Amino acid sequence: MNKKTIAMLGAGSWGTAVAIHLAKIGHKTLLWSHNPQHVALMAEQHSNPAYLPGIPFPENLIPSDNLIECVQSADYVIIAVPSHAFAEIINKIPKPTQGLAWLTKGVDPASHELLSQLVASRFGVDFPIAVISGPSFAKEVARFLPTALTLASNNTNYQKKMHQLFHHDNIRVYLSDDLIGVQLCGAVKNILAIACGISDGLGYGANAKAALITRGLAEMTRLGLSMGARQDTFLGLAGVGDLVLTCTDDQSRNRRFGLLLGREVPIPEAEHQIGQVVEGKHNAAQICAIANKNKVEMPICEQINALLHGIVHAQEAVNNLMSRPAKEE
């Protein structure tokens, strides 16, 4: 594939890591941040000390705070902002020429809609989109360690182009057309990672964590099937792959947030200690609202949402789950 110009909108750890990957394989990559001071620091240090310290930028990775200029000068546009900022970004940018891809995992907090629904409302239902998801920590991608991802799209031609853009010796990309399933996996797994962190923080051990992962997978699959997703998506990289990674490894900020809650650290202090956006905290209420709308039981997510809103404490949430009526698996 000919080398392209990429606009990466969002200079957190994940957006930066993927920008580094794309630049390393030869694409000119514009890394946008809304914060001019952040951009100046990245340009000065040729790295992102705030979110991905110690990993140098390739020469063709260029920080910028000019959103419109980045989009207009790019062949491909990728969004990597947190889910609560996604709507603001797509409403500010001009319509990209090729399509729009995103790394963001979550749902819109205002409308409870999937991010693909927001894009369809803004740019049209036939506008090419792609969602990139799967088990992937930023530091490992930035260091060129082996990673496998799922790329879901509504347009096979655009999907092929995005596949060629990303695919390399260190990143293997698998294709899907299940946009609903891939997006739900990315949102729900963060809530379940908080649950696993809480369990470990309480000292409940490996058995409890395995149960939370397994029953959590059942919850997210039920929700997905009720919304038209395919079951095999939840058994793939975007589903069980990302779920296991996020629930078991302390690189996950959602899991670390849960660990702190399990150790009775207050929510504001736990967020402060994490120092970055905890998507599961932002998306718990939205996922529960979507589940209620679709008449789907999601007891783990419901207990985490109740805990985050001060209705129950960590020990209570676990007790409520363990005391539920017996049922068939």
UniProtKB/Swiss-Prot annotation:
Keyword Protein transport part of the UniProt annotation: no
Binding site for sn-glycerol 3-phosphate: K105, G134, S136, K189, D242, S252, R253, N254
Superkingdom in the source lineage: Bacteria
GO cellular component, one term: cytosol
GO MF annotation: an example: glycerol-3-phosphate dehydrogenase [NAD(P)+] activity
Job of this protein: Catalyzes the reduction of the glycolytic intermediate dihydroxyacetone phosphate (DHAP) to sn-glycerol 3-phosphate (G3P), the key precursor for phospholipid synthesis.
Designated name of the protein: Glycerol-3-phosphate dehydrogenase [NAD(P)+]
Underlying gene: gpsA
